[in-house]
Every structure is written in structure tokens, then in C-alpha cells.
UniProtKB/Swiss-Prot annotation:
GO terms for molecular function: serine-type endopeptidase inhibitor activity. Residues 2-52 form the Kazal-like domain. Keywords: Disulfide bond, Glycoprotein, Protease inhibitor, Repeat, Secreted, Serine protease inhibitor. This is Ovomucoid. The record marks L14, E15 as: Reactive bond 3. It comes from the Eukaryota. GO terms for cellular component: extracellular region. It comes from Scythrops novaehollandiae. Glycans are attached at N41.
Length: 52
């Protein structure tokens, strides 16, 4: 699981650490993923680490 409690953040770094979301979309890093989780009102979850 990914802890998104300190998100959303206004700016994400370009750090490459891909995660695959339950929407079958690859997120570049935890920050991008967590911002999307917050935007989805918690409906988006982690499928697995790495690219989809």
C-alpha cells in the first residue's frame, strides 16, 4: 500500500519510481499517484509497483 495522507502536493518532482494504479495507468512516482488518489476521492488504488 501507499500512504497518501500528506497529499495532495502542489508540485511533484520528476523522480522516476513508477506505480500502476487500479485504473491501469502508470504514474511516474508516488506524488503523482497520490495526487490522483486524492482527486479520485479514494476510488483509485495501487495495483502494483512498477509500470502497468
Amino acid at each position: 500500500t501507499v500512504d497518501c495522507s500528506d497529499y495532495p502536493k502542489p508540485v511533484c518532482t520528476l523522480e522516476e519510481m513508477p506505480l500502476c494504479g487500479s485504473d491501469n495507468k502508470t504514474y511516474g512516482n508516488k506524488c503523482n499517484f497520490c495526487n490522483a488518489v486524492v482527486d479520485s476521492n479514494g476510488t483509485l488504488t495501487l495495483s502494483h509497483f512498477g509500470k502497468c
